[in-house]
Structures are given as C-alpha cells and as structure tokens.
A protein has these predicted regions:
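N-terminal interaction modules that seed assembly of large macromolecular complexes
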Residues: 4-70
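N-terminal intrinsically disordered, cationic/polar leader segments
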Residues: 98, 102, 119-122, 133, ...
Length: 183
C-alpha cells in the first residue's frame, strides 16, 4: 500500500519533490511563480540582480505606503511598508540595502507628517522603531558607508522638531546615543 501524503507539507517534502524535476521543469516552475505576483517578481529580480536598482520596487512600495496620496484617500500602510523591507531582506540579505530601505521608510513617514500634520501614536511608534532599527543596521556597516546615512538620520531628526507624541525626543535620544560625537 502506498504511503498516505501528509496534510501539512513541509519544506523537506517540497525539496524532495523539487529534486526529482529537471532543469526545464524548474525553469517552468520559476516562470509560473514569477507571473504569479509582483512580490515574486521583485524577489527574483533582487535575488538574481537582473535590474539596475533591485531596491526600486521596494522603495516604490514604501513610498506609496508611508507617503500615500491623501487626495485620492489613500491610507498610510505601515505593515505593508515593513513587509517590503522584510521581503527585500529575504531576497537579498544585503545590509546596505536593508539600511537604505529602513532609512527611506523613516524619511517618507517623517516627510508625510511634516507636510500633513499630526498622525497618531501608532504611526510615530512605528517610525521610532524603524529609526532605531536603521541605526542598528547602519552601525553594523563598514565605517566608510555610514556617513551618508548618518547625515540622512540627522536630517530626519532635525526636521521633526515641531512634531509631538514624543517623536522628536525619541529620535534625538536614539541619534545621540548612536553618534555621541555630534551632541
């Protein structure tokens, strides 16, 4: 009698099945996955570095989510913007690219609140957490790659001076803890 298939397949099950197919079938499978979603396309573009700027689709998503078109009634979508960063990390795992996307996330969110006013505590908490994550990622980079990011982080901090919810204070605390020489 044939062994019954498990209801919950695992990666090991999938890997065993994939190992049985030839190159042509594997390419066909990847083509199907590529056509299935924009996220898959961005993942494969980043993984195989086939586009000039693998960050571009992720930055577009972050920009649309963190600085939405308010005149078209588009909402801020923090979780979708964070997912774009996570998706890039899974596709590429490049610390420099991750630092860029994290910093860009905070830049777009900060620009949105500077231009459109007070948002809510959840929004500012998300920006503060991402600012901290960006600093941690930037500090893990080689020293010569940090300077541009440091300037961008400082610009975010200084431009937030008139924003409430403790946002500016938290940015200052995080920035000067990471870069005490600037205090």
């Amino acid at each position: 009698m044939a062994k019954a298939k498990s209801v919950d397949a695992t990666w090991s099950d999938m890997k065993a099945e994939i190992a049985k197919i030839d190159t042509r079938q594997l390419v066909s499978l990847l083509a199907d996955l590529y056509r299935f979603s924009k996220e898959n396309q961005a993942f494969l573009h980043a993984r195989f570095a086939v586009v000039a700027d693998p960050l571009d689709p992720y930055k577009r998503t972050i920009a649309e989510c963190m600085y939405p078109d308010v005149y078209k009634n588009k909402p801020v979508q923090i979780s979708k913007a964070k997912k774009a960063i996570s998706d890039y990390s899974k596709a590429e795992g490049d610390s420099l690219g991750e630092a860029e996307l994290m910093t860009f996330f905070v830049e777009r969110g900060n620009a949105f609140t500077v231009n459109f006013g007070d948002i809510d505590e959840e929004f500012y908490d998300a920006l503060n957490r991402m600012y901290r994550r960006a600093i941690e990622k930037i500090l893990s980079l080689p020293e010569k790659q940090r300077d541009e990011f440091k300037e961008r982080l400082k610009t975010i901090m200084t431009s937030s001076a008139d924003i409430g919810w403790g946002f500016h204070d938290a940015l200052c605390e995080d920035y000067y803890s990471a870069f005490p020489e600037d205090e």
